[in-house]
Amino acid sequence: MCSVILEPQEPSCNDGLAYWVASSATVESPLSEIPALREAPFPVGAPSLPGRFLRHSDEHTVVGMRAVLEAIARFPDPRPSFEAFGVVGSPCLPGRMASARTLMQLQAEGPATVSPHIVPQCSLHALASAVSVGLSMHGPNIGIGGGPEAMAEGFITSLSLLDHSNIPGLWLVFTEWKNEPTLDAQGIAPPDAMCRGVAICLMPTQRGAARLTITLPGTRLASNSDARTTPQATGTLAELAHALAACNQGDVRADWLHVCPWGAHVRISHDCAADGEK
């Protein structure tokens, strides 16, 4: 397990807000395999989606939803009900390819050829809404980010919702292209373009085997180990996925840092102190 700690504004206050990363999963798929992923069998132990639910979904939504299903499938017992959970979807540049193709089609063939699905499926909120509706989660759901700072904005939004909403937990879903694909004249991307999704389930709890710490500007560092942080360190989504996997395997070397534009530090590392408490 992992935990999240939001350091308090007052340096004299020793209590933080802690959340487990109760489960997480990463899914990567090349563009050529995403059509099959829309209709792929669900992971053993994961809930099913309505038939053809992802038929018109953007690639970010397909990969992000699959990451959530994988994380649910590996959720440790006892698995909670997710009915009241919130969802934060934080994609980086979603809907770009479909939007480009639509604009080209509009210019060439007129408005009658434009699909009505383009607006709801390519909006910033499409990912979060699909997870919430498809998996019957009735907590707040919101799309955040959409650009290069999607990770930082996703983390701070998620912790804000957990701190100020009466919800038992929250799914935070990040998506991005491994390398943002270059489209051809028809708006088509290379078939080997790789889309990545990382799903993280956050729940209030005690410390786990690792921790994810957000230190706000002007606050004290959570521990001496946090003094290692450097303003130049900016962890990527791929590195976050690797750190989460390492923490789940008990790797004491796991250490990931992302410095937000406004100065907050987001860090995940193995929590050796929690090992001693077991």
Name the predicted role of every residue range.
Residues E153-S160, H164-N166, C195:
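Internal, well-folded beta-alpha domain core
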Residues M1-P94, A98-L124, A128-G143, E149, ...:
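Conserved "HGTGT" condensation-loop signature of ketosynthase/thiolase-family condensing enzymes
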Residues L170-L172:
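Short glycine-aspartate micro-motif
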